[in-house]
Amino acid sequence: MTFASRPIRGKIQCFFGMKKISVLLIAFIAVLFSCENNMQTTATPQKLSPERPAYALAIHGGAGTILREEMTPEKEKAYNIALDSALTIGETILKNGGTALDAVEQTVTWLENCPLFNAGRGAVFTHEGKNELDASIMDGATQKAGAVGSVMNVKNPIRLARAVMDKSPHVFLTGRGAEQFAAENGIEQIDPKWFFTRERWDVLQQMLQEEKEKYGKQGWLNKPAGKNPDGKFGTVGCVALDKNGNLAAGTSTGGMTNKRWNRLGDSPVIGAGTYASNDACAVSCTGHGEFFIRYAVAHDVWALMAYKGLSLEAASDWVVNKKLVEKGGEGGLIAVDKDGNIALPFNSAGMYRGYARPGERKVMIYK
């Protein structure tokens, strides 16, 4: 099933204050009701004809325990509108002849600024009550890449990752060094208080209290290793194909709630959370990062296509629903191939996601 979405009028802007999340979501939706949209929440992309489309775009806002019965109508509406708005950012760039890289960077930037998602403004808190942000971006035409990890005062980590790719001889910068590079290259830096959201803070406090009660004073250290305790793998990502046949991918995250020791997941790791090459596909992942790193998930999809000749659908499905499941990994990915085919597989209860091609546009949450 396909449909052409009508253009969204007005500038949509996420905001967050100190009130309860239910009140915020109602206010958030009130601002957005003036925007026309035409969205559906169930569908899978249709395989394209051999003719490559003018563009293709896919996004995600994280995967995990996302259940319809736990989602209020207001909250679901807010997520759907946010996803559709993000699609509009990237699709507008691609429709006007822009590059896949620019579409990816700008789309992820918008998602970073929306507090509904665990990236940028909506980032979760570390064990110490800080926000540590990670991001990566990759150009399928040149296979150049840029990544940053554990930055705390950079408003949009994806823009810093792009600068690392374009303005340095390196691929991966972290911590204070990455922040210094941001300052030297005009990347916007901001008071870390800007990242504070009451909902994320309350989740951390609840988690700390539960660990203390269950595992003692050093609860975090005594807790057995396992899956993300809140059941969600918050990440945002975008993959794109432009009119010139170039691919790009980008991913950004606040990481895992209650993380310690500058823990990094797959999002900033090229080949694990992000990968792009014009000869096959562009991939952005979301899930239990340790598993995605161990099994080089994003690169694995590309390798199955490049070396074994699998289709995008077959390669991504095998990695997510067979290999990861067998290894105990949970999550999903978005991917687009050189012909404009799109795949959005996940093995969790839900994944915030959407995609757009000429005459076709959808956003989805549940299975």
Where are these regions (language model features)?
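Alpha/propeptide regions of enzymes that mature by internal proteolysis
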Residues: 36-367
